[in-house]
Curated annotation (Swiss-Prot):
Keywords: Autophagy, Cell membrane, Cytoplasm, Cytoplasmic vesicle, Endoplasmic reticulum, Golgi apparatus, Immunity, Innate immunity, Ion channel, Ion transport, Isopeptide bond, Lipoprotein, Lysosome, Membrane, Mitochondrion, Mitochondrion outer membrane, Nucleotide-binding, Palmitate, Phosphoprotein, Transmembrane, Transmembrane helix, Transport, Ubl conjugation. It catalyses: H(+)(in) = H(+)(out). It comes from Mus musculus. This is Stimulator of interferon genes protein. The gene is Sting1. 3',3'-c-di-GMP binds at residues 165, 237-240, 262.
Length: 378
């Protein structure tokens, strides 16, 4: 599906452009070596030397990490030293490749300018200084890419928790509760745009407890019938939703089930607590990823996707006015328009039959002599 239908500010998943640029650099470097007329065997030897140096440097860095992880074998690796070694050193093929290449250069002839012991000492010095000076850390973009790829973001956990612990429980029975509500309240939620749960996603994570304070044109009307579910040892845990009336120019313009996405309160509280180490920029990034992840989850669950609509918005910071009630009305009317389009009957008007479309008929005259084609001669 396209990323993202919710809001232009929500980022798309990262692609593979970095690998494409690396491929361009690879082709450019090969062209430079070809123009310089460097002997291929000389290029391959030094290329293998650099690869061996890189692998050896990674091994030294990982051994330093292993020294720390061995102190946490019981708590982090269930007492398995092998798991700790694998977590730090990774695939042993890299280590074997480094050893083979190092041995190759040690026994290589005609390389008087290359001393393995000198290279090893210089490499250890470089890696030690790099770790002490903090030169080995990833850039913020690399950290963000790794967290998104491995699903390690705070937003990923919040989105799944919100879906499994709340939306998956209430959305399947939402239509039955709406029908019960309509029987008691004169079909208040009978409109095509009123039969869904509208969830508000302010990207600044400002989630007040009273919607009428945010916008006086959003007025509380009533509560849907409660849903009781036995959950995590809690008998008859109550889930409830609120029905709001939306005003436009002082007149009722729509009725819907409306609420904020409560995990946004968690993100806001984390950004206010210094112990969480969560900056305002982190909060904005995680709020966007939370919306995108929840959209991806709902996209694969039709019974949940068809019962709710996400309203993602970002209030302008340049002083321009923003009306939450108008934003909600826009989504309600869009929902009604989509509902009418989906339910419109597929009718087609058949063209009137023409003479050429009729079956051919054989006309036989009862006269003895044939008549001419020109009627003016009769």
């Amino acid at each position: 599906m396209p990323y993202s239908n919710l809001h232009p500010a929500i980022p798309r998943p990262r692609g593979h452009r970095s690998k494409y640029v690396a491929l361009i650099f690879l082709v450019a470097s090969l062209m430079i070596l070809w123009v310089a007329k460097d002997p291929p065997n000389h290029t391959l030897k030094y290329l293998a030397l650099h690869l061996a140096s890189h692998e050896l440097g990674l091994l030294l860095k990982n051994l330093c990490c292993l020294a720390e992880e061995l102190c946490h074998v019981q708590s982090r690796y269930q007492g398995s030293y092998w798991k700790a070694v694998r977590a730090c050193l990774g695939c042993p093929i890299h280590c074997m490749a480094m050893i083979l290449l190092s041995s190759y250069f040690y026994f290589l002839q005609n390389t008087a300018d290359i001393y393995l012991s000198w290279m090893f000492g210089l490499l250890v010095l470089y890696k030690s200084l790099s770790m002490l000076l903090g030169l080995q850390s990833l850039t913020p973009a690399e950290v963000s890419a790794v967290c998104e790829e491995k699903k390690l973001n705070v937003a990923h956990g919040l989105a799944w928790s919100y879906y499994i612990g709340y939306l998956r429980l209430i959305l399947p029975g939402l239509q039955a509760r709406i029908r019960m509500f309509n029987q008691l309240h004169n079909n208040m939620l009978s409109g095509a745009g009123s039969r869904r749960l509208y969830i508000l996603f302010p990207l600044d994570c400002g989630v007040p407890d009273n919607l009428s304070v945010v916008d006086p044109n959003i007025r509380f009307r009533d509560m849907l019938p409660q849903q009781n579910i036995d959950r995590a040892g809690i008998k008859n845990r109550v889930y409830s939703n609120s029905v709001y009336e939306i005003l436009e120019n002082g007149q009722p313009a729509g009725v819907c089930i409306l609420e904020y996405a409560t995990p946004l309160q968690t993100l806001f509280a984390m950004s206010q607590d210094a112990k969480a180490g969560f900056s305002r920029e982190d909060r904005l990034e995680q709020a966007k990823l939370f919306c995108r992840t929840l959209e991806e989850i709902l996209e694969d669950v039709p019974e949940s996707r068809n019962n709710c609509r996400l309203i993602v918005y970002q209030e302008p910071t340049d002083g321009n006015s923003f009306s939450l009630s108008q934003e909600v009305l826009r989504h309600i009317r869009q929902e009604e328009k989509e509902e009418v389009t989906m339910n419109a009957p597929m009718t087609s008007v058949a063209p009137p039959p023409s003479v050429l479309s009729q079956e051919p008929r054989l006309l036989i005259s009862g006269m003895d002599q044939p008549l001419p084609l020109r009627t003016d001669l009769i």
